[in-house]
Amino acid sequence: MSDSIHRRKVSNPVGNGGRSSRTRRTAFRYVSDKNNRSKSSNKVFERSFSEPSLNRHRDGQSNHLRRPSPMRGLPMEEETKPIVYLPRIRSEVFASSPSLLNLYSPSSSSPINQEGNTKEAPKVIISVAVEGSPGPVRAMVKLSCNVEETIKIVVDKYCKEGRTPKLDRDSAFELHQSHFSIQCLEKREIIGELGSRSFYMRKKAPETGGSFAGISPARTSLIPSSNLIGSCIAQLIGKIMRRTRRIWNILVCVQ
């Protein structure tokens, strides 16, 4: 009995020793995994800078885009051409003629009106449709010309071409933006400031002479208006009488 008890007691530490070795192995694995995670978390990442432009480098025969990083100490390439941003671009680049760039200056808001710039004002071709004429008249005028001078140039060109109907140079004319515009342009307005190259010209309507002359056509216009009203009433009465006769004839035939 004592031997069996002693064997059991001796065998128990062996079993406990086996279990403790297993727990030590699992603990060692846990510690190693934890150390690996801490090492991966402590890895330093390189900082990336976002730059507006990409520099193209050639490595052998292949072309690829490469962005220089200041952290690596690579030298930055100097730009050969300066970058011009949109706010620095002047509005004169949208002018119709390159010679307009010389006319603009920061001290003058409307250089076309100045006397010093009128001699150097550029010329443009405008097309003017004349009332009653089949096609427009093309004339070359300066941007500094006003409406009155433009009308004279167009009338002279119209008469030289021999168009019909013939125009009297002494008569007054009006210049409009288009055929559908009611209000005419003022004679002092500058062609360069209007922003249009096509116009419509027609004869100016005659003005009434005086107060007495204006009253007489008003009275004469009342007379035909009263006659028209009476004629309309007579036509209505005649239609009613005709229809009543037709209805009467139909009733007689039915009976």
From Swiss-Prot:
Name of this chain's protein: Uncharacterized protein At4g22758
Basic and acidic residues compositional bias, start-end: 44-61
Stretches the record annotates as Disordered: 1-78
Biased segments, Basic residues type: 1-10
Organism in which the protein naturally occurs: Arabidopsis thaliana
Transmembrane segments: none
